[in-house]
């Protein structure tokens, strides 16, 4: 029964607005407390922003940079609140983490023109793993509010030769938009999308891990953007057009009347015009 309840709960969460995930998740846990751990580990939540007091830069919070009640900043590598024995990446991986944060900071500025990004890496037995987080929220200046949250979890398995690596990327994007205009009123549109991909890439000085991961994330985000634009927003536009006619109703009625008259004329011509013997 618990497996069926979990499947139903996850299916319900996929259909609810992303901007209300925390409230809906809390309500579900109150209804079925036994699903608490499974739901918290399975449902991606909107990213929260914190401020690194050491360097004065924002960073994003998630389970991957949390240890107890403290979160590690990718900029200063310090936990807030301070934690003496918190989990830390190895020296080699920390150097890679710093480079990745600088690279994706530029990527975020180029593609999103604002927002906050963070990259966290951790060691594995035969390689390493990491998460790339990007958050961009609209300020509502054009009567449009919204938020984009993308979570890219990548696992890197380094081959024994050291010249190639296997990359496994799992990406989740949560997007919601809200418009409030005099002509159309208030409209909410949102959803989440998760995609996976795996690929082997050459690792060299000209194509290091950061470049390979960057290309994978860039390709994945472009595909997800295209899917959201063509399927979700495109389908919504079709539904709205089906509910509300763009043309004025009187003009539409005149067009249908003209169709009927033309049909009658053509029918009469078929009856009275006989072929020559």
From Swiss-Prot:
Pfam families: F_actin_cap_B. GO terms for molecular function: actin filament binding. InterPro entries: CapZ_alpha/beta, CapZ_alpha/beta_2, CAPZB, CAPZB_N, F-actin_capping_bsu_CS. GO terms for biological process: actin polymerization or depolymerization; barbed-end actin filament capping; cell morphogenesis; cytoskeleton organization; lamellipodium assembly; negative regulation of filopodium assembly; regulation of cell morphogenesis; regulation of lamellipodium assembly. Keywords: Acetylation, Actin capping, Actin-binding, Cytoplasm, Cytoskeleton. Isoform 1 is detected in pectoral muscle, cardiac muscle and gizzard. Isoform 2 is detected in brain and liver (at protein level). Isoform 2 is the predominant isoform of nonmuscle tissues and isoform 1 is the predominant isoform of muscle tissues. F-actin-capping proteins bind in a Ca(2+)-independent manner to the fast growing ends of actin filaments (barbed end) thereby blocking the exchange of subunits at these ends. Unlike other capping proteins (such as gelsolin and severin), these proteins do not sever actin filaments. May play a role in the regulation of cell morphology and cytoskeletal organization. Component of the F-actin capping complex, composed of a heterodimer of an alpha and a beta subunit. Component of the WASH complex. This is F-actin-capping protein subunit beta isoforms 1 and 2. It comes from Gallus gallus (Chicken).
């Amino acid at each position: 029964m618990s497996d069926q309840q979990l499947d139903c709960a996850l299916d319900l969460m996929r259909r609810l607005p992303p901007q209300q995930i925390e409230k809906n998740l809390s309500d579900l846990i109150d209804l079925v407390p036994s699903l608490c751990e499974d739901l918290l580990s399975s449902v991606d939540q909107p990213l929260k922003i914190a401020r690194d007091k050491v360097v004065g830069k924002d960073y994003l919070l998630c389970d991957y940079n949390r240890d107890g009640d403290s979160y590690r900043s990718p900029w200063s590598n310090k936990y807030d609140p301070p934690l003496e024995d918190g989990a830390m990446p190895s020296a080699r991986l920390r150097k890679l983490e710093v480079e990745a944060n600088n690279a994706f900071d530029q990527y975020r500025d180029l593609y999103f023109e604002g927002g906050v990004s963070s990259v966290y890496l951790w060691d594995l037995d035969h390689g390493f793993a990491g998460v790339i987080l990007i958050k961009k929220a609209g300020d509502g200046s054009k009567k449009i509010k919204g938020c984009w949250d993308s979570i890219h979890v990548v696992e890197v398995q380094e081959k024994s030769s050291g010249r190639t690596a296997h990359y496994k990327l799992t990406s989740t994007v949560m997007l919601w938009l809200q418009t409030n205009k005099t002509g159309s009123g208030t409209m909410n549109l949102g959803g989440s999308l998760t995609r996976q991909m795996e690929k082997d890439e050459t690792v060299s000085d000209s194509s290091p891990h950061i470049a390979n991961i960057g290309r994978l994330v860039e390709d994945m985000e472009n595909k997800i953007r295209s899917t959201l634009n063509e399927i979700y927003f495109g389908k919504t536009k079709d539904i709205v057009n089906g509910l509300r006619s763009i043309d004025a109703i009187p003009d539409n009625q005149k067009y249908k009347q003209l169709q009927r008259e033309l049909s009658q004329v053509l029918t009469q011509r078929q009856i009275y015009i006989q072929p020559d013997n």
